[in-house]
Amino acid sequence: MAALALVFQSCSKKSRSDLGATLFKKTNNKVFKDATPEGLAEVFKKVLAEEKSHVNNPNLINAYYEANDYDPAFVMDHIFNGDVDVTATYFSKAGEHGLDPKMFNADQINALVAKFKDKKAIKNLDEAYRDIALLEITTANSLINYSNALQYGILSPRKIYQRYYTATKRPDSAGMSRIFYIKDMRHFLDSIQPKDPQYLSLQKALKDGTTAPGISKEETTRYLVVNLERLRWKNKPTQAKYAIVNIPDYRLDVMDNGKSILDMKVCVGEGRNTDKTESLVDYDESDKIDRPFDRETPQLNSMIHSVQVNPVWNIPQSIASKEIMVEAAKDPYYLSNKNIDVYENGKKIEDPETLDFANAPKDKYEFKQRPGDDNALGKIKFLFNNKSSVYLHDTPAKAAFDKSMRAVSHGCVRLGNPDGFAKVVFGEGSTYDKISQAMTEDNPDPTTIGVPGKLPIYITYITCWTDSTGTIQFRPDVYGLDVVLYGHLQRFLASNDQIAKL
C-alpha cells in the first residue's frame, strides 16, 4: 500500500472547498448545497471498505483516493461534459472485442449518472455522498478493467498454460493509474483500441457473424473470441527479423520487416487433441485445466545462438526407456543398425547385443545416436536456450511433411527445409557454404557453429488469423489450448459479472 501511495504522491490534488456549491450549480439539486469534502471523505472511506471485495484493484483505487483527499474527479470533471456517458458507450460495445459488457458496468454507470442529472433523484445528503463514492469507484474500476483488457488481455497466459515460456508484459500500477488523470475520455479510449490489422480483421468477422466453412457459427465465434484474446497479449515480436513457428498451422516463417522471406512446413510435438475430440462447443468445467502431453511443443521465445551440423543425438531418458530399450529387447541388432551407442556410467559399452534390455532398470543406460543418414535429428539442428530442451532440426523422416496433421514429433520442431533455414540464419557466404558442404558428407563429424548476431525464435499457438489475401484461416485445436483458454475466459467473465454488481 505504501508503494502505491508513492505512485500518486507527486500528483496529489487539493480538496475542493466549493464541492457543494459546484454540484448544486450543476445539478440544481438542493441536497448538494450542504455537501463538504470532509463529509464526503467520511462516507467515501466506508463505501470503499464495503466494496473492496467487488473491485479488481482495490488497493490501487484506495491509494489514489487516500492520496487525493477523496476528491471525486470523475464526478466533478467528467459527468457534466458528457465524458462519462462516452465511457459507458464504449463499455457497452465491449462485445465487439469478444468481451462481456457486464464486466465494465455500463448500465450501473448510466444509472448513477442519470441520478445526478435528475434534480429530484437524490433525496438526502447521505445518499448523495454514497452515489458520488459509488460512481467514482465504479468508473475507476471499469476504466482500469477496460484499459487492461484491451491493452494486455483479460488473462495472463503464464497462469493458465503449464508450458508457456514467452515473455509477456502485464499491466502495472503506474500504467493503471493513468486513468485518474484522463483529460479527454474519448481520446483516451480511442488511443487504447487495438490497431493491429489482424485484430481488426478478426474483430470485423466477429461483428459480422462470420461462419467458417465446416464449422458451426457458435464454434466460429469462439475461435474468434480466443484468438482476439491472444492478440491482446503483449508477447509479440519486436525485432525486425525473427523466425516464428505456429504450432496448429505446422509452419515456420522467417519475417523481415513485416514480410515473410522464408516459409516452410514443420512437424511439431504430438498433442492431446490430435483426434479432435475436444471442441470449443462441447467442453466442461474441467477443460480449463491445462494437462499437456509429454510430447507437446511448448510456447516460447528465445534466441538461436548456434547450430550443430551432423549432430549426435543424446537420446532423452523418456524416449530411451519407452522406445529404444523396447526395440533393443526385441532385436539385439537394432542399436547397431541405427548407429546408436550405449553408455553405462559414462563409459561406452562395446557389445550392447549382449545386454538384457527387457529386465534392465529404465535409467541404467544412456543412448547416443551417431551422425549419419539415419540420425533422428537429420543433418543439422538449431539451438536456443529454453526450459524444455527443444530445438529445431532436420529429419530423415520426410514422409511426415506430406501429411496435413503434422503433430508427430517428441516435442522438437522438425524443419521441412533445414538448408533454406540455415541460409537465412547465416546468409550467403563461407559459413553457410561450409555448413551446406558438411551436410552432404558420408562419414561426418559433429560440428558446432555459433550464429552471428543470433536470430529471435518464437513458437506460438494461433488457431485463427487472416492471411495475405484477406481470407480468415482456421486450424484444428491440436493441443486443446483453445478449450483451456475459453474455459478460463468463461470463468473470468462469470466472476467479474458478480464484481460488476456494485
What label would you give each PLM region?
Residues 1-4:
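Sec-dependent N-terminal signal peptides
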Residues 7-10:
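C-terminal motif of bacterial Sec signal peptides marking the signal peptidase cleavage site
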Residues 12-60, 66, 144-145, 161-171, ...:
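Well-ordered beta-sheet/strand-loop patches within structured domains
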Residues 12-163:
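Cationic-aromatic interfacial patches
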